[in-house]
Amino acid sequence: GSEMCIRDSILIDYDTGTVLAQKNAAQPFPPASLTKMMTSYIIEQRLLSGALKENEPILMTPEAWCKGSSEESCMYVPVNTTAPVIDMLKGIIIQSGNDASKAMAQHIGGSETTFADLMNEEAKKIGMTHTHFMNATGMPQEGHQASAEDLAKLAQAIIKNSKKYYPIYS
């Protein structure tokens, strides 16, 4: 038959929220780079509220910087230089940049750990009940998890609440 070889999945109707198909949708798993959906969502909400400006310079700290030899996906902003928020946001969404994610997390939260707390607060607001964030990138870390169902809720929130920035995702 046409049985999909997928472990965890969900398909929802965006307009109604109706679940059309699902498989282990509430089962938590390590979300890897899907984590960056929440990182970018928080940045977008701060831009829309005026708390951040698109042209605001963000420092690429030594902690956030990709050394080039790493296995991570990066946008490769040189260490100790700056890039505007809008470029960092595009680097997170398009290139899955861990460096941009960490630099933005440090800028907004003061540290990546504090930013993860903000991510968890936002997850609660959206109704993500099987999700817990430990970092802004999705790098493997004990206790860092999400479910397909929760990520669908986050995708809905991005489409609904970040209309201005949503085209970057396509």
Model-derived segments and spans:
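Active-site-adjacent loops and short helices of periplasmic peptidoglycan-processing enzymes
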Residues: 2-3, 7-149, 156-160
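Conserved active-site loop region of the serine DD-peptidase/beta-lactamase
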Residues: 161-170
